[in-house]
Regions:
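Glycosyltransferase specificity loop/lid
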Residues: 1-151, 237, 241-266
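Short, basic, glycine/proline-bearing loop/turn elements
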Residues: 76-80, 157-164, 227-234
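Short gly/ser/thr-rich secondary-structure transition/capping motifs
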Residues: 86-87, 107, 168-172, 212-216
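Alpha-helix C-terminal capping/helix-to-coil transition sites in glycosyltransferase folds
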Residues: 98-100, 183, 224
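Active-site-proximal region of nucleotide-activated glycan assembly enzymes
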Residues: 123-197, 203-204
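Donor-nucleotide binding loops and adjacent catalytic segments primarily
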Residues: 195-266
């Protein structure tokens, strides 16, 4: 049996898909140690995994600052992740020497998980909660003028922060190498291959498994009907207009293809 270290960022949309994976690995007799944050402790322990709190490495935020995270730029978010990695360095050095994981399973944007896997020469498997990103992504990702400017002017700032990682044994070419998928790293992607843009450009190291939902309560389904799962991430979940459009689209689809009136009250 293997010892597996899980790493994720403090976000529901990135942590939740990893929970069924942890539960299945534990069920098969593996030891899973999940490095996460206190808000997820109960969910993680429910999988049978060991929970390790990383809250001490996050700054204390006021309610106003916490709300402001939803508007933070890509540059600021990247720099913050690099700084958290530096703050966790001594702690994770000790954890890797003590736990000695056989595999690291890290969220795709959890820098401290990926960087420590590379630093300690432990095989890495990447958990991708959205689409996988590679060189083809620029063909369908349309950045606003503000986002483009942020990337252009933010690169020197990020490069400066990356330099601070070198004395700690982290060798990083550039920021893209931290977030962009490569065809040599084993990756689990929580969408279907049909929904992944340019899926043919990804190697066999990628497994597209579809939505991953972990819950002790199964949805009530008195009738054998399809289940529609709609989910947004932590950062942009407060979007009632989006959910309303999903409901509207579903109702329109049903009435176009099915004569619901023939079934009585819907």
């Amino acid at each position: 049996m293997k010892k597996i270290a899980f790493f994720s960022i403090p976000a529901h949309g990135h942590t939740n898909p990893m929970l069924p994976v942890a539960a299945e690995l534990v069920r098969r007799g593996n030891t899973v140690r999940f490095y996460s944050f206190d808000v997820f402790e109960n969910k993680i322990r429910a999988t049978g995994a060991d929970f390790v709190s990383c809250d001490a490495f996050l700054g204390n935020l006021t309610k106003k600052e916490e709300a402001g995270l939803k508007k933070v730029s890509t540059t600021e978010m990247t720099i913050q992740d690099i700084r958290i990695t530096l703050q966790m360095d001594t702690f994770l050095d000790g954890e890797f020497k003590k736990f000695r994981p056989d595999v690291v399973y890290s969220d795709s944007v959890c820098f401290w998980g990926k960087l420590n896997a590379w630093k300690h020469h432990v095989p890495l498997v990447v958990s991708t909660s959205t689409f996988a990103f590679n060189r083809m992504s620029s063909r369908y990702l349309k950045n606003s003028l503000k986002e483009t400017a942020d990337m252009i002017f933010g690169m020197p700032k990020i490069a400066k922060e990356l330099k601070k990682l070198e004395p700690c044994g982290y060798n990083v070419k550039n920021a893209l190498s931290l977030v962009q998928s490569d065809n040599e790293t084993d990756s689990v992607v929580y969408t279907s291959k049909r929904f992944q843009p340019y899926s043919e450009s990804f190697s066999d190291h990628y497994v597209f498994v579809g939505p991953s939902v972990f819950s002790g309560t199964a949805p009530s389904k008195e009738k054998e009907r399809p289940l529609v799962y709609v989910s947004m991430g932590t950062v942009i979940n407060d979007r009632p207009d989006f959910y309303a459009k999903c409901i509207e689209a579903l109702i329109l689809y049903i009435f176009i293809y099915i004569n619901c009136r023939a079934y009585g009250t819907v």
